[in-house]
Design a protein with these regions (language model features):
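Adenine nucleotide-associated cytosolic modules
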Residues: 1-385
Length: 385
């Protein structure tokens, strides 16, 4: 559970630490020492005497009592410094522990105490490797508003979210690897995107994960191998993979009107109230993604279609007649990164901007994305079922 910035309740029991990426520097203008502390977004000045000494001890290894005793600063100024740091989101005040959903953790007190005494985790090379790989992820998550444990709870919770990707384009393969590497362990390729008889072609080459030497290999077998290499957390066993998660999302990459299979699949998602997200095929240097549909609650594809017709948008008639194309290497990576970041924000529960909206992107104008929001249309009836 996170706290709001500024709501710090000091206690002698915790060991505060500066967030990853915080920098500080002592300056010496007339009138005494000051410390400038901040990050990429903003910085503040600390005027209290002994501020630099306190900052040097905010490593997460010293308790409040220890810092107070060693800093030799009055309690009022000490509390003022901590409150300022916490208000500006520069401070972590909780130390959460990564819980691996698919790794053994004993609930027997005697066994757990014995493992702790022997420092089993400190000698676990797999866990040490995981901690090294987690560092870049946590260093970004920790800067979100209200995060005060370094982002550990957020990234641990990603193991409880399920993503299924349908499609075999470069963007689909890139998204698959990004989500696995970002901690969404229950990421898989859907049955339409990964067939037993589907072989890797030159079309998929260029997604970083697949090489020219992989052409002709089984798409499903190769992706299974990649999952073990790129996944941040341990991959679930076959038994656990069959257990559906309460929170889930299906991502369809391609034209949903091209094949009866895909059209029927989306209709089935609507009937079963399964959340899904769409990514279009490239069209004349552009591509669009969205909406994220929560059937019965948010605008569906037909809601958007009716709205566009009423607005006189005739371009939608051309979208469904476009030939199947592949994105360039640069565009595939840029689009995949943008989409993955937005979906991860959705998974983490901090952003709902994908719901009921489409984003249009053109490779000739990378800084200008068009974001269009839609509402449930009364003529559609998707919310009446």
């Amino acid at each position: 559970m996170t706290q709001n910035p500024g709501s710090l309740h000091t206690s002698d029991s915790y060991s505060p630490r500066l967030k990853a990426g915080v920098r500080y520097c002592a300056i010496f203008p007339e009138g005494g020492e000051r410390v400038v502390i901040g990050n990429f977004d903003h910085s503040v000045e600390l005027h209290q005497s002994g501020a630099r000494t306190i900052l040097e001890m905010l490593t997460g290894t010293k308790s409040i009592d220890e810092i107070k005793a060693q800093a030799g600063i009055c309690e009022v100024e000490f509390d003022s410094i901590l409150t300022t740091l916490h208000t500006h989101n520069f401070l972590d005040v909780r130390q959460s522990k990564i819980v691996l959903a698919n790794r053994f953790h004993s609930n027997v007190p005697a066994i757990a105490a014995k493992a702790k005494k022997r420092k089993v985790e400190e000698r676990d090379p797999a866990l040490q490797l995981l901690q090294n790989r987690l560092s870049p992820e946590l260093s970004e998550i920790t800067w979100r508003e209200g995060i005060d444990d370094g982002g550990v709870e957020v990234i641990s919770a990603r193991q409880d979210f399920e993503i299924e990707i349908f499609g075999n384009s470069r963007i689909a393969v890139l998204l698959y690897g990004i989500f696995l590497g970002s901690g969404v362990t229950n990421t898989s390729m859907g049955t339409q995107g990964i067939r037993d008889n589907h072989a890797i072609s030159h079309r998929e080459i260029g997604s970083t994960y697949l090489r020219t030497s992989d052409v002709g290999s089984s798409f499903s077998v190769k992706l299974s191998e990649l999952a073990k290499d790129f996944a941040l957390f341990p991959i679930p066993s076959d038994r656990k993979k069959s257990e559906k998660k309460e929170k889930s999302l299906r991502i369809y990459v391609g034209d949903p009107t091209k094949e009866d299979l895909s059209t029927g699949m989306i209709s089935q998602w609507m009937r079963n109230r399964l959340d899904f997200f769409l990514v279009s095929t490239p069209q004349g240097g552009g591509i669009s993604w969205g909406p994220l549909v929560k059937p019965g609650k948010t605008p569906c594809l037909r809601c958007i279609q009716i709205s566009r017709i009423e607005q006189g948008d005739i371009s939608q008639y051309l979208e469904n007649s476009a030939d199947q194309m592949e994105s360039s290497i640069a565009t595939s990576h840029e689009i995949s990164g943008r989409i993955a970041q937005e979906i991860l924000n959705y998974v983490d529960g901090i952003d709902q901007s994908l719901v009921g909206s489409r984003t249009r992107f053109h490779s000739g104008s990378t800084c200008n994305r068009e974001h269009i929001s839609y509402a449930l249309h009364p003529r559609c009836g998707c919310a009446w079922v």
